[in-house]
Structure formats: structure tokens, C-alpha cells
């Protein structure tokens, strides 16, 4: 196996048995690809901005004399880069410029000729751009647009499952859902009449829409019914026989022919009878008159002589009419063939309840439903109906919708028009009637073939189109009214509606969310999330169990584990590891092709619709070396069911065992041993882990850690191979290999690292280099670790030595006992960065001022401020300290003559202003790490702002100068090589400045040209460098674009270091969460016979009922991994020979059935072995992939190799008494996380604060500085103890006795510790409530 430079530093021992067939795809591709489609010009006009423009343009004027045509578009350059936008609170976006063509026609009587053409580029607002990591910067904050899983456009057949009507009758319905436009529903009522609804309005008989489509009754009956033809011969009625139509009927007469009786009267006609009639080729039978009476005639019968209608179509035959027909010479009568079994008379019955009788009346009926109260005119009714389903502007099925529509109706063609036509509507009605007749089945709405994913690009395109449509109306009016000769395209387009639509979507849509940035995993999961909520989706309240449930088609597409607990369960899902969307937006998952039992390397992506036709084997099916299945019978999935199939029947096989789970769930080792509910919690809690100060890779991982860390974008990854030329805390410089260099470039890659930046969740983002000077690196290697990563692997928590045992009740109910050593070693210490801002506004009374001259504030309080009134960087501040001094003008107060005199004498200003400084919130203490000042254009900058500007300029100049020097030295190395090849002495040259080297006269023409070329390159580089500095300088010194009325904003960043403490929440990766109950001295913790104490004591009772056994297996394997690490550490300490070290590590890697990983350490140099050993001395990292992990015997092998008992249990001693505990205890290493539920953020104590307006009781919650609720049960407790005075205090002065509490406050101030309880306000509220019911209630005083 070939290892990259980073992987060689620390190899993970892999217990995976199945070979890796397919690499994990780039995890953010769903976001990036979707947005790329939106933004890149698509010549086919199917996607993105191009599609939106083409759907709206050309815009014609109402009079048709002119039109505005779309030519092309381009996106301009962004003003600020991503980091600058975040600092300034700006949106990272690019201006959209569209080339439009205005064509003016000269109208003749016969034709229009082009009179004038004007082309112009028009600005159409800003389009937010996606960063490289799949996020958007909107107003300075990082946001993610979550993909939406919505009902695919198309036609769906469904039923109410008998829930609507009290009789329990199943009512069927069909719904045509377009991508945009009106919905069309068909539904049966309990009387079996078929109705239609447009846009869920009032229902109409289905015949109305058929009449509106220009069908008359006769044509409607012809379309939907088969005919029975009765002939009248010699006063006898003869039926032209189609034998199948008799099935299931009871013969009401003897069915006979030529004297032979085939079915006796009263007998049920069976398939045997029908076959007999067919065999004897009986084409007609004589029937009694009763048989024809009551049947429904399929067409109008009109007397040819008189023109009188004898019987209209869809009317029952009676004896009287039969006679009339005979008289008028009709000897052949067509009736509808209907029966109760499979040919119901639904359309015929519906026609009877329909009051309309022609197209016009049907159109008027539709108009009345859609536009109630408006008078219908012929033109208006026709326009409305035409626009509803047949106009491309108002109705769009989309390519997906048309494909689904045609597939549902079993048509061969998948393409077609994007609007509906007559055939579509008729075919849908036919199919729903077939379903009602028992042919065909209803669709499963929760099948992933009926739900598609709408990603960022598509949603942004829809919003953009909405904006364009708003502009279209205005343009049409301008084209009709304006003076066309002077009009230019620029004059017609107003970019505001477009910008507003796009801004609204990115800023306030339910699916554009504030990014969850706790750690790299939470970022990735947020970007891969799929929500059923949002515009055009479901709502929480109305979503039933079926939608939320796991469906068989989720396999390999949507994770069955990772979903939130609570009201959103099942509505918000996560994409599976290998899943992707196809061109239609349906989720698909990869499979290996299988032919005659041979598994090939060929990979096909199948959507849920295609998958149903195949038999698919699981990933853990046994295969021999040649690729054949070893077992005759293989467990497979087919049409959502699992069963055994012959190996030769199998069509496909899963790609990987972790195919079904999401990224979050695939990081849980031994997931297969955990209960699903706990696995769900585990997957969700990993996202809440706070990045620790010192990262620590998980000893027991799943092999997904590297993929997550690299794809999340928090690490710095090498773009090209090369050698590390320079490293410091903030930058890495790589000299690129010549093979990968572009022509005319210096061959240097510079990576600037992010230092101590605030994340959305106030955690700290910081990158640290993990390469050294002179090291050779390859493309894709990790150069710097970000938050929660360790040597390019995801590291969310710490490996802790845990023991499962009770300890004096301190681990009752999931509490956790932690050793003090964990605090001392800063294992779970985290840094949180808070941004506090102070805004200086222009008020009616004058401008607020930021200064250190604050009224009534002592010297001590101002000691940390500079002369501009802003805190120093590096100052340590606590709650209540002033960060930014600010004074606000106060309204003029009436002054006494004495005060006026004093003011006139001393010119005192202090009383004009009040202190409104920015202070540190209570309970927060930390270090100021950065200050940013934003000043409005035209407002004079203070001294501190200028200092900050100078510092920034210096830093940028220094950075760019260093960058330039590196490029320059690279160029001169080139020149030196050229000189050396010409045997020119370079010692003298070294004394000359670089620029003079270019003027050295060289005889060889080709070499001279090369030097000239390099000189030109040097000149260009210098110019570019100066240009860069100038651009940066302008950006820094220009005024900021602030909100109206804001003069200045000062942002102060505080870094708070938080150690772990009682009350903090911790968890493992298996849903085993708990709160720290006590931090115990190291000497009191249980220890083993070597004197090593445990770090954490967990309650063993937390395991059996919760069924997350994965944590126990992780503990055992962790113990073995640490044991092997200890042995390597011992060998390093005793300076064993490197050959012995190599052998030992090789043995460790060879343990177990390593079918996937074969490590050969002979290819490693001695230095590499030493470096590897140093990284393994704290434990050998292990990978146990999901559903393909380490087996029990392998864990035992590992324990044995580490020299530990194979039971995984050891004898422990009590730290306090030194006595043995009575039985061996499970001790091992578990990966523990500190979650972002810190006691510091939750705990507060109320002194005196705000009260509720109505009840006058204290508010609740930390945000309102609220009190503790003393509820009903607490009152019972005090009553039970007979603590009457305490109870009285709780119900009055401590709660809502307004007078009592004021008096008590006064008494305490006076030193009089007495209280007089009065009437609680809530009692008065109760009185008023009773009075509002009309009952007078008064209190009598004794």
C-alpha cells in the first residue's frame, strides 16, 4: 500500500476485511456542483442563470413594435475577498452584467421590418458567490443553503386508505404536480362520481374539464367505455358476444346457441364457461328484452324523418324507447359495457350530475371557481383556461415532471412538452378509473423515486426567475409607452427587484441557515443535510409518521440513523457517504455490476426508480479471489425486501459496508453493536463537540477521519508537490516541483494560515503547521492542522482512561466522575472567542462620541483604555469592565439659576452626556485579542483607527514583500544556473544587486533571449506586486459602508479559556452522555497495580438498558492499542535497535485478518520508522470500519499481544484506602467529547431584574436575567414540611407582591430585616378574569 507523506507519520491499523472498491467521493460536491451549474453559462439553456434568462426573454411590448432580447451574461470581479467580507460584515458577491439587445420594428400592413437595433450591457444586481467550502458569506456571517427533498413534479395516484368516509370506503385520487403552475387533482367521492379540483379549490365534476377541452358527451363516452352492440332480428334481440365481458355475472337466462345450453339460468359464469364459448366460436347470442332494458345508450339516436331526438347519449333504455327505436328503423343499438367488477360506470354517472352541456358553460363554471365574484366574458374564460395548463409562461412540468409523467402512464417516450395536452389529461383519468376498477396500484409517495432533491443552484435560479418576472412587467410597459428612439436597454431594467429577490432568499429563506461551525464534522454534515421543510415542502405540524419513517429506498441514499431528535425527526436527513444526485435531481447510489455470479470492478449509479428492477447483494457477501460469490445462496435486496437468491440471479452488489450511513454515523466505531436510538444520539452529539486546545486523534477510529478533515476545508492541503521552503505559525511556503510548474511562473505556493478567528458558534478557528523545513510533500498532503484535527485526521475529543464502576454515588444517573489530572493537563480546555460591538450613532440631540472622557467613572475603570477610549489588545478583562468608552448626549434638563451660574463659570459639560459604554457582560472574563474599527465615509478617524490601519498596512506590506523576495530568489536561482552553464564566474555577481544581473552581456543568443525573458518576468512581477499593495492600501484606508445613522463601529474580540468543570456535558460516540458531577483529586481515583490512576469513572448501569455495547468494545480495543503504544514507548526509552523496533511494529500491524491493509515497513527508511514510532508511543491508532470492524477474537489477540488480560478487566485499588475493589473492573481507553453545553453559558443567579407586565412575576431564563420557577410540586414540598413562612415569602415578596417587595428592599437598605406580605398581583389577575366572565367577586375586610 502506498502511503502519502502525512500518512507515513502515523499509520492507522485497519481491521477492514472488504477491499476498497470506490474511494469516498468529495463530500461537499452536492453543494459545489449545484452552484457551479447555476453560475456557469450553460449553452443548452437547461440550467442556471442562462435558463432563467431564456425563459423570460425576449420581452415584447404590448403593441409588438419592439422587443428586448437577451444575448449573454458575465459575472464581474468581487470587491472584497472572503476574509475581508467577514471582517466588514459585507456580502461576498459579484456584480451580474447582462448584454441585452433592443430591437425596434417598423410595422407595414403585411410584415414587420427591423428599424433599429441597440445593444448594451446592463447591471442586474449582485449574485452571492459560494466559497471554496460550499458556504456563502451574507452580511459577514457564513451561511449554508440546505438542499430540499420535495415531491417530484409529475402525476401521482393515491388513496385515502379509507380514512375519509365513515363507511371505510377507499377513495382514490390522482394529482398532477407541475414544477410551477396550477395543481390538477382528480378524486372519487363516496358515490363513485369522479371530480376535478384546480389548485385545491372547490371540486367540479370531471366532465366539466373534458367539455372545456372541447369534447361532447358522445365523444367522452367513446373515450372511456367499451360498447355492447345489440341487434334486433325478427323481433328478437341478439347480442354481439365478447365472452370475457360475461365473467363474474350470474346468468339471468339460459345461454344457448343452436339448442345447446352453455350456461344454465342462475349459474355464475366462470372462466371455464368463457373458454367453452370461445372454443365453439360463438359470436352472438339471443337475449331476452329484460337484458337490454336499463342499459345506457352510448350515442344520440335521432329520427331521420322528423329530426326528433328519440334518446340522447348516456340515457337508460326503457321498453317505450325501444319500441320507438324499432319504429324509426334503428335495428342496431350501442350501449355502454359496465359491470360491478372491473368496468364501473363512473364517468357516465358523473356526466349525469354535470349541469354544463357545452364548452362555454364548462369554461364559465371553471372561471367562477377560480375567480369568484368576477363577471365571466367569453374571452376571459378562454384565456384563463388556456393559461392554467397550456401556456409555457404560466405552467411548467419541467423535464423531470415530463419524464415522471410519461413513466407513470407507461409511455415509452420520456421527453415531451413541458405543458399539458388533451391526451395527458385523458390518460390520467383513464388510469385513475383503472385503479378504481382494480387494475394497477397507487403510488408510494415516500418512495425516493417520487421525491427529488432541490439544491442551492436550483433554488437560487427559481428566486432569480421570480425577480426577472417582476422586472418583465415594468419592461413591457416601458416598451409600449416610452419614446423608443431614445430608449436604451439600461433605461428599462431596474436591478432592485432582482437583487431583492436573491437577497431575500439568501438572507431569510428557511433553507438558508446560519452555518453550524462547532467543528469540521458539523460543517460537513450541515452542507450534506437534506430537509423536507421549507418553501414548497412540508410543515412540521402536518407531517405524519409515514413521511418521517425510514423507507427501503433510503438504502445508500439517505442515512437511516442521523436525524434530529424532537419535532423535526425524519424530516431533516443526512446524505449517505456515497450518494449523489443525478441530472433529474433524484438520489442515486453506486453498485458493482455482477454477471453470472462474478463481481466486476464496473460501477453503476442507480436511482431508486431503477433499483427496483434489480437483485442486489450486500457488501459483506463472501467473494473468492477471482471475484465469484462463494455461497450458492446470497442475501439480497429486491423491491424493498430482503431474501435469499441464487448467486447467478444477482445483478449488482453494494460498493461498501458504510454505504448506507452518513458521514457522521460512519465515524462511530462498532456502530453495528449499538442500538439505533443511541447511535442516532451519538451521531448528533459528535457535531456538538467543542475543539479542544490540544487535539488528540481517536485511538479507535473508522478510517473516515482523514476524509472528513481534508474535505471540510479546515486544514491546509498542498495544491502541488514540492519542498517546504519556509514555515512559521502564520505561513507555509512550498517550492513547487518543476514537473508541476506552469510556464512563466516562479514556482512558489504560499499558504497563509488562519489564526485565532471566531467561528459562528464562538469556538476558535486556528491552524497550526504540521510540516517541517525541507520536507518533501506530495499534492493533497495536509500541511497544517485546523480546529479538531490532528495530523490531518479528525480529532473531536480526547482518549481517556475510563473505568466502568460505581464510585460513591458520584456517577448516579449518568453522572461522570473526572480526575483532577484531566484539568491539570488541559485535556478538555477550550478557547471561546466572543465578539462584542459598540455602535456610535447620530442621535437627534447630536452624535454619540467614543472617548475615554466618561462622566462619573473612576481612574481605575479607565486603566485598560487608550486615549481614544478603546481597550488595549492583550488586556485581561472581567465582568463589568469598560471595553469601549462612549457617551451619549442627554436631553436638556431644566437647570436652577445656581447651576446655570456654576456652568457659566466652569464650562462644565459632564451633565450634558450620559455614559453608554460597552462593558464586558457579567460572568465573562477573558483576554482582548483583537479590535476592529469601522468608520463611516467622511467621519474623521481617531488615533486608534489610524494605528490599526498602519499595523494592517505594515503586515500586508511585509507579507507581500516576503512573497516577492521568495519569487525573486527563485528567479535568480534560475539565472545563476544559466550563468553556471556558461562557465561565468558568479562570485563577483553575488556582490552586485539583483537588477544589475540582467545587464550582463552574453554572447550566446539563445541564452541572452532566456535572460531577457526572465528580466521581463521580473519587471512584470514587480509591477504586479506594487499594484497589489496599492489595491490593499485603498481597501484598508477607504471609509466603510455602514447602516444609516451609524458613524462608527468598534468590535472587540475576547478570548475566553474554559477548563472542564462540574456541570459541563460530556459524551462518548455511542450516545453515552452525562454531566460531570465532581472533579476528584488524582490521589483519590481508583488505580491499577502499576499505580496508574483512571481519568474517568462511568456508571456500568448506563450500558445494559441502553444496548450500546459499542462503547465496551471500544474500551477493550482502546486498552490494547494503548498497551502496544506503551511497549513501543519502552523500546524508544531503552533505545532498542531500529531493526527490533521495525519488527515489533510490523508484528502489531500484522495482527488479525488484515485483508484490506498490508503494511510493509521494509520500504520505510530508519528515520521514517523512528518518526512513526514516536507518533505511535501514545497508542497505535486503529480503524474499525462500520459493519466491517474488528471481531471479538481479534480484540483478544490485540490484548494478548499488548500483554493484557483478554477479559479486558483488571484489578483496581481504591485511591482513598488503598484496598482492592472486590472484583475486576473493565478499564480501557474511550474517546470522550466535551459538548457545547457548558455550565458557564447556562448558569446565572438573579438579584433584582425585570418582571412580567401582567402577572408582575419575575421573568424566566438567562436571557431575561430571570428567576427560578417555584412550581406546583415545589409548593407541595414546602406544604409537606410545614414551612409556612418560607412558603408565604415565596408566594408574595419573592414573587408578585409589588408593594411588599418594594417595602422589603427599603427595609433591607435601612437595616430592618422584616417583611410585610401583601396581596399577590396574580390574585388580582384571577379576580379580573372571573369578573370578565360576568361574575362579580369582591374581597371583604374583616
Curated annotation (Swiss-Prot):
This is DNA-directed RNA polymerase subunit beta. DNA-dependent RNA polymerase catalyzes the transcription of DNA into RNA using the four ribonucleoside triphosphates as substrates. InterPro entries: DNA-dir_RNA_pol_bsu_ext_1_sf, DNA-dir_RNA_pol_bsu_external_1, DNA-dir_RNA_pol_su2, DNA-dir_RNAP_su2_dom, DNA-dir_RNAP_su2_hyb_sf, RNA_pol_bsu_bac, RNA_pol_bsu_CS, RNA_pol_bsu_protrusion. NCBIfam families: PRK00405.1, rpoB. The keyword Transferase applies. The gene is rpoB. GO terms for biological process: DNA-templated transcription. It comes from the Bacteria. One of its GO terms (cellular component) is DNA-directed RNA polymerase complex. It comes from Buchnera aphidicola subsp. Acyrthosiphon pisum (strain Tuc7). It holds the Pfam family RNA_pol_Rpb2_2. Keywords: DNA-directed RNA polymerase, Nucleotidyltransferase, Transcription, Transferase. The RNAP catalytic core consists of 2 alpha, 1 beta, 1 beta' and 1 omega subunit. When a sigma factor is associated with the core the holoenzyme is formed, which can initiate transcription. It catalyses: RNA(n) + a ribonucleoside 5'-triphosphate = RNA(n+1) + diphosphate. Its EC number is 2.7.7.6. One of its GO terms (molecular function) is ribonucleoside binding. It is an enzyme of class 2 (transferase). Belongs to the RNA polymerase beta chain family.
Amino acid at each position: 500500500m502506498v502511503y502519502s507523506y502525512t500518512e507515513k507519520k502515523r499509520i492507522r491499523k485497519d481491521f477492514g476485511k472488504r477491499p476498497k472498491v470506490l474511494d469516498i467521493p468529495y463530500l461537499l460536491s452536492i453543494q459545489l456542483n449545484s452552484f457551479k451549474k447555476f453560475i456557469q453559462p450553460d449553452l443548452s439553456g437547461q440550467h442556471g442563470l442562462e435558463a432563467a434568462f431564456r425563459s423570460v426573454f425576449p420581452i415584447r411590448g404590448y403593441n409588438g413594435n419592439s422587443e428586448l432580447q437577451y444575448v449573454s451574461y458575465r459575472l464581474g470581479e468581487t470587491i472584497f475577498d472572503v476574509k475581508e467580507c467577514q471582517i466588514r460584515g459585507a456580502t461576498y458577491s459579484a456584480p451580474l452584467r447582462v448584454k441585452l439587445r433592443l430591437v425596434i420594428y417598423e410595422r407595414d400592413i403585411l410584415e414587420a421590418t427591423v428599424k433599429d437595433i441597440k445593444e448594451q450591457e446592463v447591471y442586474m444586481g449582485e449574485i452571492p458567490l459560494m466559497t471554496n467550502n460550499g458556504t456563502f458569506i451574507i452580511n459577514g456571517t457564513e451561511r449554508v443553503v440546505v438542499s430540499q427533498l420535495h415531491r417530484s413534479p409529475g402525476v401521482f395516484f393515491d388513496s385515502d386508505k379509507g380514512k375519509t368516509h365513515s363507511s371505510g370506503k377507499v377513495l382514490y385520487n390522482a394529482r398532477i404536480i407541475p414544477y410551477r403552475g396550477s395543481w390538477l387533482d382528480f378524486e372519487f367521492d363516496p358515490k363513485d362520481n369522479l371530480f376535478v379540483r384546480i389548485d385545491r379549490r372547490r371540486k367540479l365534476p370531471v366532465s366539466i374539464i373534458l367539455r372545456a377541452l372541447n369534447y361532447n358527451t358522445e365523444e367522452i363516452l367513446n373515450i372511456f367505455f367499451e360498447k355492447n352492440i345489440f341487434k334486433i332480428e325478427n323481433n328478437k334481440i341478439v347480442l354481439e358476444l365478447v365472452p370475457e365481458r360475461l365473467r363474474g355475472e350470474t346468468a339471468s337466462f339460459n345461454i344457448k346457441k343452436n339448442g345447446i345450453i352453455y350456461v344454465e339460468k342462475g349459474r355464475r359464469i366462470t372462466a371455464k364457461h368463457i373458454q367453452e364459448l370461445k372454443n365453439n366460436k360463438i359470436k352472438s347470442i339471443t337475449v331476452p328484452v329484460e337484458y337490454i332494458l336499463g342499459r345506457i345508450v352510448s350515442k344520440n339516436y335521432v329520427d331521420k324523418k322528423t329530426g326528433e331526438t328519440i334518446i340522447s347519449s348516456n340515457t337508460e333504455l326503457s321498453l317505450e324507447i325501444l319500441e320507438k327505436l324499432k319504429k324509426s328503423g334503428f335495428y342496431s343499438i350501442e350501449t355502454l359495457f359496465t359491470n360491478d367488477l372491473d368496468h364501473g360506470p363512473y364517468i357516465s354517472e358523473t356526466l349525469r350530475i354535470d349541469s354544463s352541456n357545452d364548452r362555454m358553460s364548462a369554461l364559465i363554471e371553471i372561471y367562477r371557481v377560480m375567480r369568484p365574484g368576477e363577471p365571466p366574458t367569453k374571452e376571459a374564460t378562454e384565456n384563463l383556461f388556456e393559461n392554467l395548463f397550456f401556456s409555457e409562461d404560466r405552467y411548467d412540468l419541467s423535464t423531470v415532471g415530463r419524464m415522471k409523467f410519461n413513466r407513470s402512464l407507461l409511455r415509452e417516450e420520456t421527453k415531451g412538452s413541458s405543458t399539458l395536452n388533451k391526451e395527458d389529461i385523458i390518460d390520467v383519468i383513464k388510469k385513475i378509473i383503472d385503479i378504481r376498477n382494480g387494475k394497477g396500484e397507487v403510488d408510494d409517495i415516500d418512495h425516493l423515486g417520487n421525491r427529488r432533491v432541490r439544491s442551492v443552484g436550483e433554488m437560487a435560479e427559481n428566486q432569480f426567475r421570480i425577480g426577472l418576472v417582476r422586472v418583465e412587467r415594468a419592461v413591457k410597459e416601458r416598451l409600449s409607452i416610452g419614446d423608443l428612439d431614445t430608449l436604451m436597454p439600461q433605461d428599462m431594467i431596474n436591478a432592485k427587484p432582482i437583487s431583492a429577490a436573491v437577497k431575500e432568499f439568501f438572507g431569510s429563506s428557511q433553507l438558508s441557515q446560519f452555518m453550524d461551525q462547532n467543528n469540521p464534522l458539523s460543517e460537513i454534515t450541515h452542507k450534506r443535510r437534506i430537509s423536507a421543510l421549507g418553501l414548497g415542502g412540508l410543515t412540521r405540524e402536518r407531517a405524519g409518521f409515514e413521511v418521517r419513517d425510514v423507507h427501503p429506498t433510503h438504502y445508500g441514499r439517505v442515512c437511516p440513523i442521523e436525524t434530529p431528535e424532537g419535532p423535526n425527526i425524519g424530516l431533516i436527513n443526512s446524505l449517505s457517504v456515497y450518494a449523489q444526485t443525478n441530472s433529474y435531481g433524484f438520489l442515486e447510489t453506486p453498485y458493482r455490476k455482477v454477471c453470472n455470479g462474478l463481481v466486476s470492478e464496473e460501477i453503476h449509479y442507480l436511482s431508486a426508480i431503477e433499483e427496483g428492477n434489480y437483485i442486489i447483494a450486500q457488501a459483506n457477501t463472501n467473494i473468492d479471489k477471482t471475484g465469484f460469490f462463494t455461497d450458492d445462496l446470497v442475501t439480497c435486496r429486491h423491491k424493498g425486501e430482503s431474501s435469499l437468491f441464487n448467486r447467478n440471479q444477482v445483478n449488482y452488489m453494494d460498493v461498501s459496508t458504510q454505504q448506507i450511513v452518513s458521514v457522521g454515523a460512519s465515524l462511530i466505531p462498532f456502530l453495528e453493536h449499538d442500538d439505533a436510538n443511541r447511535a442516532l444520539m451519538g451521531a448528533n452529539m459528535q457535531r456538538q463537540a467543542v475543539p479542544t486546545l490540544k487535539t488528540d486523534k481517536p485511538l479507535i477510529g473508522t478510517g473516515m477521519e482523514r476524509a472528513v478533515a481534508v474535505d471540510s476545508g479546515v486544514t491546509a492541503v498542498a495544491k502541488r508537490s514540492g519542498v517546504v521552503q519556509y514555515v512559521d505559525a502564520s505561513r507555509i511556503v512550498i517550492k513547487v516541483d518543476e514537473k508541476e510548474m506552469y510556464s512563466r511562473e516562479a514556482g512558489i505556493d504560499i499558504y497563509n494560515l488562519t489564526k485565532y478567528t471566531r467561528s459562528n458558534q464562538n469556538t476558535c478557528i486556528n491552524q497550526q503547521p504540521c510540516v517541517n523545513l525541507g520536507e518533501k510533500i506530495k499534492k493533497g498532503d495536509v500541511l497544517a492542522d485546523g480546529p479538531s484535527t490532528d495530523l490531518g485526521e479528525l480529532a473531536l475529543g480526547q482518549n481517556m482512561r475510563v473505568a466502568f464502576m460505581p464510585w460513591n454515588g458520584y456517577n448516579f444517573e449518568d453522572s461522570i466522575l473526572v480526575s483532577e489530572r484531566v484539568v491539570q493537563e488541559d485535556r478538555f480546555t477550550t478557547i471561546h472567542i466572543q465578539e462584542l460591538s459598540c455602535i456610535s450613532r447620530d442621535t437627534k440631540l447630536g452624535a454619540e462620541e467614543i472617548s475615554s472622557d466618561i462622566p462619573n467613572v473612576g481612574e481605575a475603570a479607565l486603566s485598560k483604555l487608550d486615549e481614544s477610549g478603546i481597550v488595549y489588545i492583550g488586556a485581561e478583562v472581567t465582568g463589568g469592565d469598560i471595553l469601549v468608552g462612549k457617551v451619549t448626549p442627554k436631553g436638556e434638563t431644566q437647570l436652577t439659576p445656581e447651576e446655570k451660574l456654576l456652568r457659566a463659570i466652569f464650562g462644565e459639560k459632564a451633565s450634558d452626556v450620559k455614559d453608554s459604554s460597552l462593558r464586558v457582560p457579567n460572568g465573562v472574563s477573558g483576554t482582548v485579542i483583537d479590535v476592529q474599527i469601522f468608520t463611516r465615509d467622511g467621519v474623521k478617524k481617531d488615533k486608534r483607527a489610524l494605528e490599526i490601519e498602519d499595523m494592517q498596512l505594515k503586515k500586508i506590506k511585509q507579507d507581500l514583500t516576503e512573497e516577492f523576495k521568495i519569487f525573486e530568489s527563485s528567479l535568480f536561482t534560475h539565472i545563476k544556473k544559466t550563468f553556471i552553464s556558461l562557465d561565468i564566474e558568479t562570485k563577483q555577481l553575488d556582490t552586485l544587486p539583483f537588477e544589475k544581473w540582467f545587464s550582463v552581456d552574453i554572447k550566446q543568443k539563445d541564452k541572452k533571449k532566456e535572460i531577457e525573458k526572465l528580466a521581463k518576468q521580473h519587471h512584470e512581477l514587480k509591477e504586479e506586486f506594487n499594484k497589489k499593495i496599492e489595491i490593499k492600501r485603498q481597501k484598508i484606508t477607504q471609509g466603510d459602508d455602514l447602516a444609516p445613522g451609524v458613524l462608527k463601529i468598534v468590535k472587540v474580540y475576547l478570548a475566553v479559556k474554559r477548563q472542564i468543570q462540574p456541570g459541563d456535558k460530556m459524551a462518548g460516540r455511542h450516545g453515552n452522555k452525562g454531566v460531570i458531577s465532581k472533579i476528584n483529586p488524582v490521589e483519590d481515583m481508583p488505580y491499577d497495580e502499576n499505580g496508574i490512576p483512571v481519568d474517568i469513572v462511568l456508571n456500568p448501569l448506563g450500558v445494559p438498558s441502553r444496548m450500546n455495547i459499542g462503547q465496551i468494545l471500544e474500551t477493550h480495543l482502546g486498552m490494547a492499542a494503548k498497551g502496544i503504544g506503551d511497549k513501543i514507548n519502552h523500546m524508544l526509552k531503552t533505545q532498542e535497535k531500529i531493526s527490533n523496533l521495525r519488527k515489533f511494529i510490523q508484528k502489531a500491524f500484522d495482527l488479525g485478518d488484515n485483508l484490506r491493509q498490508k503494511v510493509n515497513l521494509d520500504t520505510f527508511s530508519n528515520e521514517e520508522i523512528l518518526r512513526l514510532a514516536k507518533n505511535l508511543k501514545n497508542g497505535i491508532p486503529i480503524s474499525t470500519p462500520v459493519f466491517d470492524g474488528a471481531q471479538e477474537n481479534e480484540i483478544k489477540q490485540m490484548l494478548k499481544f499488548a500483554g493484557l488480560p483478554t477479559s479486558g478487566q483488571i484489578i483496581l485499588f481504591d485511591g482513598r484506602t488503598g484496598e482492592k475493589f472486590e472484583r475486576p473492573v473493565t478499564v480501557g481507553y474511550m474517546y470522550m467529547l466535551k459538548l457545547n453545553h457548558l455550565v458557564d453559558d447556562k448558569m446565572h443567579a438573579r438579584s433584582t431584574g425585570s418582571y412580567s407586565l401582567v402577572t408582575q412575576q419575575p421573568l424566566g431564563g438567562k436571557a431575561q436575567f430571570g428567576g427560578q420557577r417555584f412550581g406546583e410540586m415545589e409548593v407541595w414540598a414546602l406544604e409537606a414540611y410545614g414551612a409556612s413562612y418560607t412558603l408565604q415569602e415565596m408566594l408574595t415578596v419573592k414573587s408578585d407582591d409589588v408593594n411588599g417587595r418594594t417595602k422589603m428592599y427599603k427595609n433591607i437598605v435601612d437595616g430592618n430585616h422584616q417583611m410585610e406580605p401583601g396581596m399577590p398581583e396574580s390574585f388580582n389577575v384571577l379576580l379580573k378574569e372571573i369578573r370578565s366572565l360576568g361574575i362579580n367577586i369582591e374581597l371583604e375586610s374583616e
